[in-house]
């Protein structure tokens, strides 16, 4: 018997491992948080432990489609707080913060590099590639176990315009904020919000359209008795003659044109 979850793309994305992970204390928090998030239908993106203004533990999470709402963050915080209190991965008081990955998000999974192909990214390597650790350029997708990057940071003619960066050797990767990225993020956000509202019954489905509704497709326009097609929207009369006549009518000089 086939496992239904194996055919569900959301389950495949939930099970996809992160290739870029955190060291130290953040790794301990990630080991605790990831299973809880996955059980709720979310993916862990990044853990960041900061000592500024006290200790803050920031957990970035998302749905399999890359979206997340304020309600999701509240639900995650409510479920994760008691688990972290029991496991106690940090030996001092801290503030838990649940957030979205943001527009200029970290890239931590293979699907991230594939999804954002065509967008500008910055990549820092844990292992140097041809003597360099930092690269910037347009993502060109993934081939085998490496990210193809078309560089825009070339400084001399000896540098390669395209490089293949092994994903397991990447220490940090994130998108660069551009107008194109902002536009796509807004588009995806609107689509995700619309789908969520429709699934909750808050937003009715879109009305049928003649181009998509089979019942309306090919329906002829009504005709008059003489066989001519009924006119569509009649445009306003805006010839010079009508404008002059309207002005004279307004001044009371003449009667309107016959039939008008």
Curated annotation (Swiss-Prot):
UniProt keyword terms in alphabetical order: Cytoplasm, Ribosome biogenesis
Cystine crosslinks: none
Compartments, record wording: Cytoplasm
GO process annotations (BP): ribosomal small subunit assembly; translation
Keyword Transcription regulation: no
Region (Disordered) location: 198-260
NCBIfam families: PRK00092.2-5, PRK00092.2-6
Role this protein plays: Required for maturation of 30S ribosomal subunits.
Name assigned to this protein: Ribosome maturation factor RimP
């Amino acid at each position: 018997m086939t496992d239904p979850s194996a055919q569900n793309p959301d389950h495949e994305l939930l099970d996809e491992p992160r290739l870029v992970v955190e060291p130290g204390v953040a790794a301990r928090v990630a080991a605790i948080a990831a299973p809880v998030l996955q059980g709720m239908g979310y993916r862990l993106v990044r853990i960041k432990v900061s000592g500024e203004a006290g200790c803050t533990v920031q957990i970035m999470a998302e749905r399999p489609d890359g979206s997340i709402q304020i309600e999701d963050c509240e639900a995650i915080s409510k479920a994760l707080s008691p688990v972290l209190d029991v496991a106690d991965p940090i030996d001092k008081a801290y503030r838990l913060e649940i957030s979205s990955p943001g527009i200029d998000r970290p890239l931590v999974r293979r699907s991230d590099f594939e999804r954002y192909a065509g967008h500008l990214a910055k990549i820092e390597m844990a292992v140097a590639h041809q003597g360099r650790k930092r690269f910037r350029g347009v993502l060109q997708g993934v081939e085998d176990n490496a990210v193809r990057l078309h560089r825009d940071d070339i400084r001399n003619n000896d540098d390669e315009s395209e490089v293949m960066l092994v994903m397991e050797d990447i220490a940090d990767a994130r998108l660069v904020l551009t107008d194109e990225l902002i536009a796509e993020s807004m588009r995806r956000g609107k689509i995700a919000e619309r789908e969520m509202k429709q699934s909750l019954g808050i937003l009715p489905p879109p009305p049928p359209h003649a181009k998509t509704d089979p019942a309306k497709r090919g329906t002829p326009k009504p005709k008059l008795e003489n066989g001519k097609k009924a006119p569509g929207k009649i445009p306003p009369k805006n010839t010079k003659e009508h404008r002059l006549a309207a002005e004279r009518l307004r001044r009371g000089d003449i009667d309107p044109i016959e039939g008008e």
